């Protein structure tokens, strides 16, 4: 299933590890990043803006690092 605006998604850890996005982030990511779901707020090119179900800022991740929840 393609990722689109409003979709609930999960991060695929195997695709996220060693990516540019992972290297630019703190190595101690909180559990909700991999255990919970997030909602796609916007898509621009190869990136999707994700809002997790906790009160934290949104993040931009590559669409190929996400899977439908």
Curated annotation (Swiss-Prot):
Q: How does it sit in the membrane?
A: Peripheral membrane protein
Q: Where in the cell is it found?
A: Cellular thylakoid membrane
Q: Quick one: where is this thing mainly located?
A: membrane
What superkingdom does the record give? Bacteria
Q: Where are the transmembrane segments?
A: none
> Mind naming one GO cellular-component term on file for this protein?
plasma membrane-derived thylakoid membrane
**InterPro entries, A to Z:** NdhO
EC assignment: the record states 7.1.1.-
**Which reaction is this enzyme known to catalyze?**
a plastoquinone + NADH + (n+1) H(+)(in) = a plastoquinol + NAD(+) + n H(+)(out); a plastoquinone + NADPH + (n+1) H(+)(in) = a plastoquinol + NADP(+) + n H(+)(out)
Q: What does it do?
A: NDH-1 shuttles electrons from an unknown electron donor, via FMN and iron-sulfur (Fe-S) centers, to quinones in the respiratory and/or the photosynthetic chain. The immediate electron acceptor for the enzyme in this species is believed to be plastoquinone. Couples the redox reaction to proton translocation, and thus conserves the redox energy in a proton gradient. Cyanobacterial NDH-1 also plays a role in inorganic carbon-concentration.
State the oligomer form and interacting partners. NDH-1 can be composed of about 15 different subunits; different subcomplexes with different compositions have been identified which probably have different functions.
Similarity annotation: Belongs to the complex I NdhO subunit family.
Under what name is this protein listed?
A: NAD(P)H-quinone oxidoreductase subunit O
Organism of origin: Acaryochloris marina (strain MBIC 11017)
